């Protein structure tokens, strides 16, 4: 029996999204060859903090209801989950903008954001709303198996983001921040166009009564998934905020390049696979079918990609970073030899995290996320170490938590398979 059926919908959908993701991520990676020469490491360090903050705030926007768009058996219910998520997102964006209007300077002090870049924080609410809105729309595309449309949107975002960052780069550092905003705007507009063209949403099916109904039906998402997901997101960015606090923004700028390179193909392909897996597992669960086959196939692919990246980074990272981005960035290559293990384990766990939601076992995932946050917070007690040793402690925590994730997920899958066979 062949390991992977290349004609299966699961494989084709994965291939479409992965292909679009790779193209979308090649755009910023190739542009780094130019951007790293016109922006300073300090610019990238500040933008890294900005982007990390954005990744936290988007969790608040829809109270995690967006993940429930795929779950309902009928489209009417799903459309109202989508509408509820968008309503919450715009409400949060408005509140966040008002907060920044009155407390911008205090917020800069709290997150240790360089004051020379403080004006760009006003873009955060707008980018958060756009980013979250597209995530909501993308779940609708995934629900309707419009994976090609989702792939096109990813490319559109990176294309317009890249053009803006290059175009404004010769003027001032604002290009990085404005480029991110323009990219998110392009993503939403492209998503709306794709939905209107291929999967029209009927406005007469939306009502406050129905939104209230789905808000109560899927209340587990804000009650049990919002808090732990927020803690997990903070845990993902906390090590880098601590580096900015304990060491320097310049060093964070070098590590930011390391993160970007290691994230391709790892982080973004994991999101892509997770979305396809989410749709497939949700469908199988609704029909009482096994999910082991898909998980085994994708697991072997992830393992192969991870091993390949580790080998390349360990053998040639400092040389490649210095040769491609400039000699001073060989330091980023040194950092990558340590951080690569964190990224490959995150790659695997992120790809399978949607299974908890699809099987409606988010409480178990929430416990893991909370424990992960607690361990990451312990990094505060290692601030006396050198930067290299600090990174080694961080990676050790990541590996331990990833192994715990695999054990927990394995137990849940085993119980599910046992139930459907009875």
Question: Which positions does each model-derived feature cover?
Answer:
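Membrane-water interface segments that mark the loop-to-transmembrane alpha-helix transition
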Residues: 8-24, 49-50, 54-55, 59-107, ...
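Transmembrane helical elements of multi-pass membrane transporters/channels
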Residues: 13-28, 156-157, 161, 176-199, ...
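Interfacial segments at transmembrane-helix termini and the short loops linking adjacent helices
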Residues: 39-45, 104-124, 315-344
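Hydrophobic alpha-helical transmembrane segments
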Residues: 48-49, 118, 122-125, 151-200, ...
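Helix-loop junctions and terminal segments of transmembrane helices
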Residues: 59-77, 143, 258, 262-287, ...
């Amino acid at each position: 029996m062949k390991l992977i059926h290349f004609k299966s919908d699961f494989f084709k959908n994965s291939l479409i999204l992965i292909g679009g993701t790779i193209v979308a991520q090649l755009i910023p990676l190739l542009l780094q060859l130019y951007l790293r020469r016109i922006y300073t490491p300090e610019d990238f360090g500040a933008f890294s903090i900005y982007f990390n903050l954005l990744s936290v705030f988007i969790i608040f926007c829809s109270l995690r209801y967006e993940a429930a768009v795929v779950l309902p058996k009928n489209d009417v219910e799903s459309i109202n989950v989508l509408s509820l998520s968008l309503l919450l997102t715009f409400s949060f964006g408005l509140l966040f903008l008002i907060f920044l209007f009155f407390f911008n300077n205090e917020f800069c002090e709290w997150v240790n954001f360089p004051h020379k870049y403080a004006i760009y924080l006003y873009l955060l609410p707008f980018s958060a709303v756009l980013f979250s809105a597209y995530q909501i729309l993308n779940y609708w595309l995934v629900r309707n198996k419009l994976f090609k449309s989702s792939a096109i949107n990813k490319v559109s975002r990176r294309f317009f983001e890249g053009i803006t960052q290059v175009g404004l780069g010769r003027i001032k550092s604002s290009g990085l921040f404005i480029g991110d905003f323009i990219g998110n705007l392009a993503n939403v507009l492209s998503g709306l166009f794709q939905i209107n063209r291929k999967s029209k949403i009927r406005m007469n099916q939306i009502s406050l009564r129905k939104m209230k109904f789905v808000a109560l039906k899927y209340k587990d998402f804000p009650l049990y998934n919002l808090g732990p997901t927020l803690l997990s997101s903070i845990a993902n960015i906390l090590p880098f905020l601590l580096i900015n606090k304990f060491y320097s923004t310049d060093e964070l700028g070098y590590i930011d390049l390391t993160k970007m390179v290691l994230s391709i193909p790892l982080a973004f392909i994991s999101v892509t696979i997770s979305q396809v897996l989410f749709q497939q597992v949700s469908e199988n669960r609704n029909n009482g079918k096994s999910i082991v086959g898909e998980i085994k196939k994708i697991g072997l692919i992830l393992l192969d990609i991870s091993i390949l990246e580790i080998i390349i980074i360990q053998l040639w990272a400092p040389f490649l970073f210095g040769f491609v981005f400039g000699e001073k960035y060989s330091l980023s290559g040194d950092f990558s030899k340590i951080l690569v293990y964190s990224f490959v384990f995150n790659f695997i766990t992120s790809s399978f995290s949607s299974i908890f939601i699809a099987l409606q076992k988010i409480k178990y995932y929430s416990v893991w996320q909370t424990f992960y946050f607690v361990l990451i917070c312990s990094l505060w007690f290692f601030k006396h170490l050198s930067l290299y040793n600090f990174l080694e402690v961080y990676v050790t925590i990541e590996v331990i938590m990833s192994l715990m994730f695999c054990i927990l997920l394995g137990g849940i899958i085993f119980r599910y398979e046992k139930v459907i066979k009875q």
